[in-house]
Curated annotation (Swiss-Prot):
Residues 8-290 form the tr-type G domain. Signal peptide: none annotated. This is Elongation factor G. One of its GO terms (molecular function) is guanosine tetraphosphate binding. One of its GO terms (cellular component) is cytoplasm. GO terms for biological process: ribosome disassembly. Its main location: cytoplasm.
Length: 712
């Protein structure tokens, strides 16, 4: 089967934004105008097509990025048909992992901002992620029909808050309830959408007289931005004082692809205005898979040679599994982005991360949660495969004759954990299956069993993250469970270098045990080293035989899992085995493993041990009247205020760093202090030393036989 759409007419885009900027509604409209969905779904009724998990519809927020394929030929059918793969990404900080994950597989992004709220904290997080993956993007200012809407203020905020370089190619006609359409600065005509056809039809008209000057000023700004793309365009502009439509589009496109500018549009998705022009901009300014840098990976050879894969059907097959979802009808769905080559139904693929080959059962193209079976996928495609058993998020799938491992995704460690206990014996097995599946879908969610208490501990990126996991466990898998209080994921580390002996000698009749080591423990800078633990040996003259080095390392690592101070995992330690002795008959692996463990346990307590706690970056937006109370409350929570910004409408944004331990129940307290008018967002910033008075309480509880984490 030949390719239906040339790869140059593909656009793989993500739509991402702050909560409530109207992102899901925008995506809904895209599906409506491109003819995929015949009834517009409204988030207000809980019927939006992209928000297809029940929890999303109830909470009105998007949690999992659904991938959808649609086709567009332009508002006035002025383009050949293009295929647009849209990935809807969540806007809540607890789900930043989903955004990070989709940024990896996108070629371009559309950032949606609220015309009233402007650039909010989450917008900055998403912007940083897009910068990290060098994703070309355009901006769409939504909700132009809302009271307080101001397009030009958002343009300013993009410059000041994001350090962006926005170039509007439309300006709004009216705002709030007088918002009727936009002036297209490239055509220099007004676009008015027909309300009866829900915006399917539109007409070009004259620019309203009171907008002519504004439109001219912003057009000049746009043409200058386009002219800066090349010397040739600049010369043309200086000679003629203007550029043709084709030159403007070519110039803006070149600069958008280089991430030098962000083309900016506006509209109201809810009122069916502006999204159509934004779709045209996706075709005009965002890259096809052939226009972004070829994906890089590592070949399967001794030297781990770096290589790249061109976006072409002729190249060997390579793809990245960027999302795994459980579907109650077909089982595991693995979403893949194909970078090169062709994959047909029934083909075998190789997963170099797991060293396994698997056969593809079915291939389906998703439209939100409806699926269509297809026979093959080619370079540039995004689709889901059915029947892959051992693939986890971030794995590479490739041709087994041309093995390549694409760059892995990085997933942050969880900062909050809680205990879950099944209510009945029957729930026990269901719970472990459910948690296993959910952890496979979401790499920022972890599950482990606490060795001392035997409890199942789940860990994630925030309270909302874990709430939703527990909720899904109940709904999708029918598991009834009791939920413990949230606990902070503390860590332990050392501040000075020590040398310590560790010895195990047992003489009982027959073969005894003998292991004897000297270990040096040194503080390790986790950020600089890029790892939490390092083992080295400086043994001279075979005083400890080589075959026992691994056992010593293992003994230390096992002891680090449940730290010495308060039972929390130890990080930031370099252990060096430098001396010891052995016995010809009695020495074995177990003896040296125990000796290593003892040396670590005793040395750790002498090396200035400290407890580390997760510190969160908190941003509170509050009306000025409540600022004093909110600042005072943050200080009481051991918060450090980092700065303040003035927002429109007498609102202040307070940025602070606050220990996670002090943030439980913050939402309720903040609401009552501000009569429900303040909002906040929170994301993990770093680990820092816990103040002595706080740490002493946690350690005393642990030593008195209390369970770790009972820091309430």
């Amino acid at each position: 089967m030949a390719r239906q759409t040339p790869i140059t007419r593909y656009r793989n885009i993500g739509i991402s934004a702050h909560i409530d900027a109207g992102k899901t509604t925008t995506t809904e409209r895209i599906l409506f105008y491109t003819g995929v969905s015949h009834k517009i779904g409204e988030v207000h009724d809980g019927a939006a097509t992209m928000d297809w998990m029940e929890q999303e519809q109830e909470r009105g927020i998007t949690i999992t990025s659904a991938a959808t394929t649609c086709f567009w030929s332009g508002m006035g059918n002025q383009f050949p048909q293009h295929r647009i793969n849209v990935i809807d990404t969540p806007g809540h900080v607890d789900f930043t992992i989903e955004v990070e994950r989709s940024m990896r597989v996108l070629d371009g992004a559309c950032m949606v901002y609220c015309a009233v709220g402007g650039v909010q904290p989450q917008s900055e997080t998403v912007w940083r992620q897009a910068n990290k993956y060098k994703v070309p993007r355009l901006a769409f200012v939504n909700k132009m029909d809302r009271t307080g809407a101001n397009f030009f203020r958002v343009v300013e905020q993009m410059k000041t808050r994001l350090g962006a370089n926005p170039v509007p190619i439309v300006v709004p006609i009216g705002a709030e309830d007088t918002f009727t359409g936009v002036v297209d600065l490239i055509e220099m005509k007004a676009i008015i959408w027909d309300e009866a056809s829900q915006g399917m039809k539109f007409e070009y008209g004259e620019i309203p007289a009171d907008l002519v000057d504004t439109a001219q000023e912003w057009r000049t700004n746009m043409v200058e931005a386009a002219a800066e793309a090349s010397e040739e365009l600049m010369d043309k502009y200086l000679e003629e004082g203007d550029l043709s439509k084709e030159d403007i589009i070519a110039g803006l496109r070149a600069r958008t692809l280089a991430s030098e500018i962000q083309v900016m549009l506006c509209g109201s998705a809810f009122k069916n205005k502006g999204v159509q022009r934004m779709l045209d901009a996706v075709i005009e300014f965002l890259p096809s898979p052939t226009e972004v840098k070829a994906i890089e990976g590592i070949l399967d050879d001794k030297d781990e040679t770096k290589a790249s894969r061109e976006a072409s059907d002729e190249a060997p097959f390579s793809a990245l599994a960027f999302k795994i979802m459980n579907d109650k009808f077909v089982g595991n769905l693995t979403f893949v982005r194909v970078y090169s080559g062709v994959l047909k139904q029934g083909d075998a693929v190789y997963n170099p991360v797991k060293s396994k080959r698997e056969r593809i059962g079915r291939i389906v193209q998703m439209h939100a949660n409806e699926r269509q079976d297809i026979d093959e996928i080619r370079a540039g495609d995004i689709a889901a495969c059915v029947g892959l058993k051992d693939v986890t998020t971030g794995d590479t799938l490739c041709d087994e004759k041309n093995i390549i491992t694409l760059e892995r995704m990085e997933f942050p460690d969880p900062v909050i954990q809680l205990a879950v206990e099944p209510k009945t014996k029957a729930d026990q097995e269901k719970m472990s299956i459910a948690l296993g599946r959910l952890a496979k879908e979401d790499p920022s969610f972890r599950v482990h069993t606490d060795e001392e208490s035997g409890q199942t501990i789940i860990a994630g990126m925030g309270e909302l993250h874990l709430d939703i996991i527990v909720d899904r466990m109940k709904r999708e898998f029918g598991v009834e469970a009791n939920i413990g209080k949230p606990m902070v994921a503390y860590r332990e580390t050392i501040k000075k270098t020590v040398e310590q002996e560790g010895k195990l000698v047992r003489q009982t009749g027959g073969k005894g045990k003998f292991g004897h080591v000297y270990v040096r423990l040194e503080p390790l800078d986790v950020e600089a080293a890029g790892k939490e633990y390092e083992f080295a040996e400086e043994v001279v003259g075979g005083v400890v035989p080589k075959e026992f080095f691994g056992a010593v390392d293992k003994g230390i690592q096992e002891r680090m899992k449940n730290g010495v101070l308060a039972g929390y995992p130890v990080v930031g330690v370099k252990a060096v085995l430098f001396d010891g002795s052995y016995h010809d008959v009695d020495s074995d692996e177990l003896s040296f493993k125990m000796a290593g463990s003892y040396a670590f346990r005793d040395g750790f307590m002498k090396a200035d041990p400290v407890l580390l706690e997760p510190i969160m970056k908190v941003e509170v937006e509050t009306p000025e009247d409540y600022m004093g109370d909110i600042m005072g409350d943050l200080n009481r929570r051991r918060g450090m205020v980092q700065g303040m910004d003035d927002l429109p409408g007498g609102t202040k944004a307070i940025k602070a760093e606050v220990p996670l331990a002090e943030m439980f129940g913050y939402a309720t307290q903040m609401r009552s202090m501000s009569q429900g008018r303040a909002t906040y967002s929170m994301e993990f910033a770093k680990y820092a030393e816990t103040p002595r008075n706080v740490a002493e309480g946690i350690i005393a509880k642990f030593q008195a036989g209390g369970k770790k984490g009972d820091d309430e």
